[in-house]
């Protein structure tokens, strides 16, 4: 199961019979969260894996953390790593110190430390739509 923050990226993802793509449009609503939690319970021990792909920014980090906390505790980031960040850095947007301080102050799960470090080292963020180029 792959949750995708941005509609353009969701629409461009290729179909794979063994994968369910879910457009998250940012944060899931309470009803959407309940549906996804029920789906997780129905799948039980069938070996389903959970991934989320998002903007490489503060919002993307927060959405991932929300999914991990409220829906899929074992969710993994997809294309939210150092390699992806530097591949698309040319499309990045410079951020001011106030924004970077919010990122700095956020306790992220281990799987997003690399992304947090990239944002803080470069001072920029990348919208997921940039990855369509």
Label for each model-derived stretch:
Residues 1-133:
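Catalytic core segments in nucleotide and nucleic-acid processing enzymes
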